[in-house]
A protein has these predicted regions:
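Hydrophobic alpha-helical membrane-insertion segments
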Residues: 61-83
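N-terminal signal-anchor transmembrane alpha-helix
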Residues: 1-47
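Helical transmembrane-bundle signal
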Residues: 13-21, 45-49, 71-75, 117-124
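Canonical alpha-helical transmembrane segments
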Residues: 41-64
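Alpha-helical membrane-associated segments of multi-pass integral membrane proteins
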Residues: 10-15, 91-135
Length: 144
């Protein structure tokens, strides 16, 4: 259940970041380069998220979850770096409030998803190992 929520929030982050990237392509200089990089990262992240959503209930779901969360961690980290580069030039633009607010919310969501990716990639294997070795064991003793 948490994995579906994680992947859904990831997809929302990629859609919002794509809106920011398309809007950034209207401006020149740093925004064009970072906008193209954000679009590439959005497509990569959306593909990984779609793969995670399709394989969330499969036999190898633990491996898929860990690999997808590590890949998404790298993608969100790069998106955060692009947002930092764009924030340096953002103060010189006197444009719409929508641009600035969508940028702020996209940055916050990317940071939240970066933290969630890190937590998920670390906690899921630990939870699996604890459950595997210390979970309830079935016995074949008919007296119990």
């Amino acid at each position: 259940m948490l994995n579906k929520i994680y992947y859904s929030f990831s997809m929302v982050a990629f859609v919002l970041s794509a809106v920011v990237a398309f809007y950034a392509l209207r401006f020149g200089d740093v925004f064009t380069q970072e906008g193209i990089q954000l679009l590439f990262l959005d497509l990569t992240g959306a593909g990984v998220t779609l793969m995670g959503l399709l394989n969330v209930n499969s036999k190898h779901s633990l491996f898929t979850i860990v690999v997808a969360s590590l890949v998404l961690l790298v993608v969100f980290y790069q998106m955060n770096a692009s947002h930092i580069m764009m924030a340096d030039s953002l103060s010189s633009i006197q444009d719409s409030v929508f641009w600035k607010e969508s940028f702020v919310w996209s940055s916050r969501l990317v940071l939240m998803m970066m933290a969630w990716s890190l937590i998920q990639s670390l906690c899921v294997p630990i939870f699996f190992l604890v459950h595997r070795f210390f979970g309830t064991k079935k016995t074949n003793d008919p007296l119990i």
